[in-house]
Structures are given as structure tokens and as C-alpha cells.
């Protein structure tokens, strides 16, 4: 049987074909030029032809992929989670803990600017209740130092968690008062036709949230 003439992928190469030419122009020129003889009934020749064709197609794919732009994938940095800390919708962080001295009731310790501050407040409460057996976010040494810095003390018969809550509440009030006094000194306030509402503070709002959560939990 006479061998069939099968178009070879490389039969179209000529001096006119340049490196910058596209695969389309290469295939179009190859259809009008020389052909290599392959016997369609010869398995070895057809296998060789298949390898040549596959190699050519892979070359086209690799060449095209080099021209594709590389997309940078930005990974969102996940926030570190701390024990006893919740993020509030307005961006601040609340610390809370279950008071083992009062039948495990959940106590809101306060709202803080950062998750680390809230986590430290939780650690202070946990350490004051359970001592070295407490599971903490930070090291016990750091927690002990922070308790010394805020001059933490509590009376016998009083919950150490409640004492810490009062301590944080007093510190927030003092900080807010200093901030308001500073703002008032640096600006003049015009009160013509202005209705002034009483600022109940974050603590009141947090207590409302805490009471609603407790009513749904217990």
C-alpha cells in the first residue's frame, strides 16, 4: 500500500518564517509547503507523528503563556483571635469572662481600643480568680506586671472580677474626662439653636448589650 502524505508540523518552516511570527501564520504557511511522508497504517510512523504534533502544540502553549500577565494574589491578613475578646460592630473590642466566684455568671469587663488591651483585661481577671492554673492569652509575668501597674486590689468577700471591672470603668471615665476637657479648651462651642443630648457613655451601651445577650443565653 502506498504511504499517505500527512502534513508534518515542521514542514512549513522556511527562511521567510521569523521567530516573532504567530503560530497561525506558521500553520498557514505550512499548509502550502512541503510535506513529509507518513504511512497511516504503520503504527510506529503514526506514533512518531503524534509525538511531533504534541511537541509542537506544547511549544505554542508555553510561548503564549509567557505573554500572559502575572496576577498578584493579595492575601488578607486575618486578625488574631484572643480568649474572652469580642469585636464590636463599631470597631472596638470587648472583654468578658465567666465569674467562677458567682456561679459562672458572665461579666463584661469593658470596651477597649485594641484586641490586645481587651485580651490583657481578660487575663487579669482569669489570673486573679485562678492564679497559675488560669489559661491566659499572654505570659503570667506580663499579666502580673499589668496588675501591679493598675494597683489592683480587692477586698475579702468581693469578686476579683467585679473589682477589676470597676477599676477599668474608673480608668475609662478619667481618660474620657481628660479628652473632653482637652477638646473643650482647644475649640469654641456655639450652642445657638442646638439640642444637646446626655452622653450615657459606652459602658451603658455595653451593659444593654450584655443584658440582652445574657437573657438569650441563660
UniProtKB/Swiss-Prot annotation:
InterPro entries noted in UniProt: AP2/ERF_dom (IPR001471), AP2/ERF_dom_sf (IPR036955), DNA-bd_dom_sf (IPR016177), ERF_plant (IPR044808)
GO MF, one annotated term: transcription cis-regulatory region binding
Record's keyword terms, sorted: Activator, DNA-binding, Ethylene signaling pathway, Nucleus, Plant defense, Transcription, Transcription regulation
Sequence segments annotated as region (Disordered): 1-38
GO cellular component: nucleus
GO BP term, pick one: jasmonic acid mediated signaling pathway
Pfam families: AP2
Localisation: Nucleus
Chief location: nucleus
CDD domains: AP2
Tree of life domain: Eukaryota
Function in brief: Acts as a transcriptional activator. Binds to the GCC-box pathogenesis-related promoter element. Involved in the regulation of gene expression during the plant development, and/or mediated by stress factors and by components of stress signal transduction pathways. Seems to be a key integrator of ethylene and jasmonate signals in the regulation of ethylene/jasmonate-dependent defenses.
Family matches, as PANTHER family: DNA-BINDING DOMAIN (PTHR31190), ETHYLENE-RESPONSIVE TRANSCRIPTION FACTOR 1B (PTHR31190:SF132)
Family per similarity comment: Belongs to the AP2/ERF transcription factor family. ERF subfamily.
Subunit structure: Interacts with MED25 and TAF12B.
Protein's name in the database: Ethylene-responsive transcription factor 1B
Organism: Arabidopsis thaliana
Amino acid at each position: 500500500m502506498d504511504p499517505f502524505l500527512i502534513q508534518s508540523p515542521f514542514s512549513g518552516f522556511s527562511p521567510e518564517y521569523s521567530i516573532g511570527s504567530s503560530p497561525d501564520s506558521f500553520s498557514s504557511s505550512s499548509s502550502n509547503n512541503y510535506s513529509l511522508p507518513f504511512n497511516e497504517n504503520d503504527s510506529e510512523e503514526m506514533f512518531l507523528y503524534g509525538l511531533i504534533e504534541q511537541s509542537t502544540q506544547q511549544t505554542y502553549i508555553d510561548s503564549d503563556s509567557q505573554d500572559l500577565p502575572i496576577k498578584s494574589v493579595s492575601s488578607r491578613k486575618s486578625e488574631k483571635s484572643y480568649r474572652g475578646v469580642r469585636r464590636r460592630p463599631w470597631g472596638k473590642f470587648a472583654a468578658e469572662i465567666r465569674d467562677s466566684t458567682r456561679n459562672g455568671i458572665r461579666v463584661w469587663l469593658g470596651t477597649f481600643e485594641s484586641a490586645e488591651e481587651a485580651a490583657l483585661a481578660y487575663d487579669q481577671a482569669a489570673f486573679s480568680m485562678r492564679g497559675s492554673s488560669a489559661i491566659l492569652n499572654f505570659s503570667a509575668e506580663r499579666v502580673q506586671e499589668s496588675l501591679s501597674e493598675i494597683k489592683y486590689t480587692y477586698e475579702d468577700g468581693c469578686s476579683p472580677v467585679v473589682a477589676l471591672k470597676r477599676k477599668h470603668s474608673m480608668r475609662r471615665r478619667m481618660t474620657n474626662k481628660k479628652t473632653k476637657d482637652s477638646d473643650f479648651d482647644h475649640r469654641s462651642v456655639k450652642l445657638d439653636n442646638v439640642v444637646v443630648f446626655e452622653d450615657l457613655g459606652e459602658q451603658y451601651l455595653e451593659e444593654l448589650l450584655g443584658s440582652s445577650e445574657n437573657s438569650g443565653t441563660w
